[in-house]
Amino acid sequence: MFTRLGSERGAAAVEFALVVPVLLLLLLGIIEFGRAYNTQIELSGAAREAARVMAVRNDATAAKAAAQAAAPSLNPALTTGQITIGLSNGSSCAANASTTYPVVTVTAAYPLKFLTGMFGSTITITGKSSMQCGG
C-alpha cells in the first residue's frame, strides 16, 4: 500500500502562503478598477453639468465652475485647465441667422494616480458630454 514519509503538518500554511499573493493581486486590481470606474462616472457627470450650464447661460467660466462643483470627490480637485469647451459654430451658444442652435461639447480629462502602481503611475480618464444650446 502506501506509507507516510512524514507528517503533513503545516501543509495548509504552505498552500495558504502560495494562494495569498494571487488573492491580494486580485483584490488590489478590483479596488483600482473600482476607483477608475468611479472617477469616469464622476467626470461624465461633471461634463454633463458643464454642458447644461453652457447651453443655458452661454458662460464658459460658469460652466467650468459647475463642472468643478459636480466632481467633489476627486482629489486633487478638477481644475479649469482640465476642462475644455467646444462649440459646433466655434464662437458662442447664440443662434445664427438660420435660427439653428449650435451644439456645445464639454470634455473633462483627469489624471488618476493609482494607489498600488500595479498598472503604472497614472492614467488619464475622460468624461464627455454634448448638448444643444438654447435651453
Task: Give the residues covered by each predicted segment.
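Short, conserved structural patches
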Residues: G45-G135
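Alpha-helical assembly-interface signal, strongest on the long, hydrophobic N-terminal helix that forms
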Residues: M1-A71
